[in-house]
Amino acid sequence: MIVCHQHRFIFVTTRKTSGAAIEAALATACSDGDIVSATTHAALTQYQPGDWLRLMTRGERARLDRHQSAAQIRSRVGDAVWSSYFKFCVERDPWDKAVALYEQRTRGRDPRPTIAQFLAKARPESLSNFPLYSIDGALAVDRVIRFEHLAAELDAVGHLLNLPAELFQAIEWPQTCHYSAVLGPAERGLIEAACAPEIELFGYGFAEVAPEDR
C-alpha cells in the first residue's frame, strides 16, 4: 500500500499481482511524509501478539500490512485525501491467480499437496482481491489495472500521474502454467464461488487455452 502526497495517488496492493514489485517501483517516486507499507510502522493498536513479542524481545517495530484494504486506508488518511487522490490497484484472472497462490505457498513443501488439496483448505478471502479494493461491496478505486495487460496499463497510469517514464521498466511479469492444465471442475467451481464479485465486474471467464503474452 502506498499513499503518495506529492503525486496525489493511492495504490492498493492486491495479492498475486506483482504488487510488491509495483509498490517498490512506486516508492521511488515517494518522499518523506508519504505512506509506504514496506517502510511505515504500524500503529500499536494494530499489533498482533507476534508483533508485541518481537517488539519486547528484539526491539523490532512492525511494518504496515502491505495488503491494507480500501476501507482501512480511507480510515487512515481521512475522507478528504481519499476522495481527492487517484486510487488504483491491479486485478488478475481469478483462476490464474489461484494457481500462482498455490505455487507460492506450497513451494518447497514435502510432501507437496496437490492443487485440489490446497484449494479445498484455502480461505475464500485468500483467493479474492475484491474485498481489498471495494467498500461495502462497491468498487472503491478509480482504476483497476488488468494483470493481463500489466505493462501497458502501468505505463498509462504512470503518464497520468506524471511519474518517470522508466519507473516500471525493471518489473518482471511472473509466468505460471496455464490454469486449464491443472484445475479440474471442482477447483474451477470453488474459485468461481470465492471470486464471484470480480468475475461479474470484469467479465472473467474460464479459458481453455492460454491468452496472448502480456
How should each PLM-predicted stretch be described?
Residues 1-214:
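Membrane-interface amphipathic segments in extracytoplasmic regions
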